[in-house]
Amino acid sequence: MLRETEAAKRFHELVVPHLGEALGLARWLTGNKVDAEDVVQESCLRAFKAISTYSGGSAKAWVLSIVRNTCFTWLAKHRPKSLLLTDDPAGVEQMSRIAGDAAATPEAQLIAKADTQKVERAIFNLPHLSREIVVLRDINGLSYREIAVMLTIPIGTVMSRLAKARALLARELGVSHDEA
């Protein structure tokens, strides 16, 4: 068992750098920022309690696994069996930054914002398993292996689910799968 100061230091090194991504994943899974913040707070408590069990590997994948599991526990406790997502997605910070950097004029910024909102809505409209795979890979940047370990499925299943999810996303956005 780690002393509390050692545990706090490890928590700061392993968990804190990934809190933004943790909030993003929780937001995608819960559908809103307030619930996501609750999930991340609970995840931080769980991560701190389990910090001595971290055995190496990707800290990001470890943290996001805790967030994912906490999210499912939270949803089972606080949500009805059928989950309705709001049509007011708060956005993904990373996508907003990319859109903001590329937009030099007010007109370009409006177009970028509209495009970002369209993509966010399309992701929210994906079935849960598809949305989860897309968020973990394309937004949080986890490797196929990290996703496979997190979801306890073979890498091939990750790849096929991601391909299907991307095809659904392309269809939702009105682009051919070859263009996506």
Language-model features: where?
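Structural recognition of an alpha-helix C-terminal capping motif at a helix-to-coil junction
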Residues: 38-45, 49, 57-69
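A short pre-motif secondary-structure segment
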Residues: 133-137
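C-terminal edge and immediately downstream basic/flexible tail or linker adjoining helix-turn-helix-like DNA-binding
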Residues: 2-5, 9-11, 83-84, 93, ...
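Helix-turn-helix DNA-binding motif, specifically the short coil turn and the N-cap/start of the second
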Residues: 32, 143, 152-157
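Short amphipathic alpha-helical boundary/capping segments
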Residues: 13, 118-126
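Arg/Lys-rich amphipathic alpha helix in sigma70-family domain 2
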Residues: 65-87, 112
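A short, charge-rich alpha-helical start-of-domain segment used by transcription regulators
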Residues: 1-24, 34-37
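Residue-level preference for hydrophobic side chains embedded in well-ordered alpha helices
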Residues: 14, 18, 22, 43, ...
